[in-house]
Design a protein with these regions (language model features):
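A short, glycine/small-residue-rich beta-strand->loop->alpha-helix junction that serves as a flexible
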Residues: 1-6, 27-29
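N-terminal strand-loop element at the rim of the active site
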Residues: 11, 16-70, 158
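Acceptor-binding helix/loop patch of EC 2.4 sugar-transfer enzymes
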Residues: 56-73, 120-138
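Short His-centered aromatic/hydrophobic patch
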Residues: 81, 99-105, 122
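Membrane-proximal helix-turn-helix segments that form the acceptor-binding/catalytic region
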Residues: 83-92, 134-153
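A short helix->loop->beta-strand "cap" motif at the edges of active sites that frequently abuts
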Residues: 114-118, 148-149, 169-172
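Carbohydrate-associated surface elements
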Residues: 157, 176-179
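A short helix/loop element that forms part of the nucleotide-sugar donor recognition site in Leloir-type
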Residues: 185-187
Length: 187
C-alpha cells in the first residue's frame, strides 16, 4: 500500500490543494527514509502519542470490538476519539480526510470523528482479511463503512464484499484504481 500511496501522491497536482500525510510516529521511527520519498509540497502531521483511556473507555472499546457496544459505550468512545482528534490536529480545518490504507483500528476510529467529509479506501477483500488473518476488526469495519462518507475500493471485485459482508451503502462506493508511478520505475 505504501508504494501505491507514493505513486498516487506523485500523480496529484500538488499546487491545487494542500496535502498532508498523517501517520503514527512509531511506524517510521525504524525507517525514516520513507519520509524522503514524499513529494515536495506534501505536509506531515505525525501522531506522536498514544491514546489515553480511562477504565470505562477501555471497557467500552473492548465491548465495541466484540460487537456488544451499547449507546453509553458508543457515546463514550466517540467523545474519546473526538478528544484525540483535537489533541492531534487542534483547530486545523481540512476539506476532507482520507484513511488511505483502510487498516488499523485506531486510525479508523480517529478519522471517523473528523469534522469534514471522510473517505476510507479498500485495498483488499476485508471480509477475507478479518476471517483469515484477523488483522482488522469486523465490527469496527462495519461501523466505518456505515459512517464514512465515501468508500473507495481499488477494484470492482472489492465492492461485493464491502456491501454483502459489512452492509455498506452502494451509493457511497466509488472505485478508484491504483495509480502506478511508471516514471520512477523507468528511472
Amino acid at each position: 500500500i505504501t508504494t501505491v500511496l507514493y505513486s498516487q501522491l506523485h500523480a496529484l497536482d500538488l499546487t491545487r490543494y494542500n496535502y498532508f500525510i498523517s501517520f503514527r510516529s512509531l511506524y517510521v521511527k525504524d525507517h525514516p527514509e520513507r519520509m524522503e520519498r514524499l513529494p515536495d509540497g506534501v505536509g506531515i502531521y505525525p501522531l506522536a502519542s498514544e491514546m489515553n483511556m480511562d477504565l470505562l473507555t477501555i471497557a467500552a472499546q473492548l465491548l465495541k470490538l466484540k460487537g456488544h457496544a451499547g449507546s453509553w459505550s458508543e457515546c463514550r468512545l466517540h467523545t474519546a476519539y473526538r478528544r484525540e482528534w483535537k489533541k492531534h490536529f487542534g483547530s486545523t480545518e481540512f476539506a476532507c480526510v482520507i484513511h488511505y490504507n483502510g487498516y488499523e483500528a485506531y486510525t479508523t476510529a480517529l478519522l471517523e470523528e473528523a469534522p469534514c467529509p471522510r473517505s476510507i479506501w479498500v485495498h483488499n477483500d476485508m471480509a477475507k482479511e478479518v476471517h483469515l488473518k484477523g488483522n482488522m476488526n469486523a465490527h469496527l469495519l462495519k461501523e466505518a463503512y456505515h459512517t464514512y462518507d465515501h468508500i473507495v475500493p481499488v477494484s470492482e471485485d472489492l465492492i461485493q464484499p464491502v456491501v454483502s459482508e459489512f452492509g455498506a451503502d452502494r451509493s457511497r462506493i466509488t472505485v478508484i484504481h491504483n495509480c502506478h508511478d511508471f516514471q520512477s520505475v523507468l528511472e
